[in-house]
Amino acid sequence: MKRSLQNKRQYSVELDEEGYPIEPQLEDESEYEPQETPRKKKSLLRKLIIRLIAVGLVVLLIELGILLWSGQIWFNEPKKKDFPVRFPVIDSDCGEVYWSKFGGQNIQACYIRATKSTNHVDERFEKNWADSRKSGLPIGALHIFDLSADGKAQAENFLSAAGDMTGRLVPAVEISPNILERIFSPGVNEIGANLRDFVNAVKEKVGVTPIIKCSSAAYDKYIKGEFSDCMIWYESLYSQPDNDVDWTFWEYTSRMQLESFEKQGRRLHMSVYRYGEDEFNKLIIGKIPN
């Protein structure tokens, strides 16, 4: 049995048989749903735009990361007009090199890792050294310096492997020790003396002073102020070398990809020469005044 109560304001409420209020039934509840205001619509649109921008930025960063990882771009890459001569360093990890095609890849030279310490010779150096003439590029040989080994003995190993360097680029020696090598290596003076012995032995045999390739840490610790007679091949992967470094070569990336290799996808160390092509050609042995 339904009853109605009426208050002083003439507001009636229907009660059920137990005396509880009965909620009124709406004919079409959708008519009573709150309608979106223009301000709310603008807020939703703004949120949608922000989300789309955020997604776009994430996709862009992922694509940029892939390009950097693959070596297709590098944020520190020097401009071609400023540094027209650029070249990679290769070793046996590249597998066979197709030298006849190698030179047509916007590179002007190449260095080949030849030896390390007193007895190690790169397993593909002899073939690469001979076949590299097919590229038509100036080619140089690189020795990896062992901080704990005798400098003269290292020079003998390098010179024996490289042989006659007439028509080749000035030879180079790399001193870029890792953390463990720096911890367990001899003192700075002994390392400097061994490196000096290497430099002098190569100069005496070849007639030119070798280039020293070094990391920034090695430069500060072993090279700076001690080897002013040597050209410097400086590694700086995130910015151009500091003004106080008198560099000749600058290694700007270790992730460059080139073709003409048996093992595709190999990432290479890439460097530039500080000056123009005419000056660079003077680094070919036989064209340098002794």
Predicted regions and their residues:
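Functionally critical loop-and-helix segments that line ligand-binding/catalytic clefts
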Residues: 2-4, 8-16, 20-29, 76-92, ...
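Substrate-binding cleft of extracellular glycoside hydrolase catalytic domains
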Residues: 72-74, 79-97, 112-199, 203-208
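Short, solvent-exposed loop/turn segments at secondary-structure junctions
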Residues: 180-182, 218-221
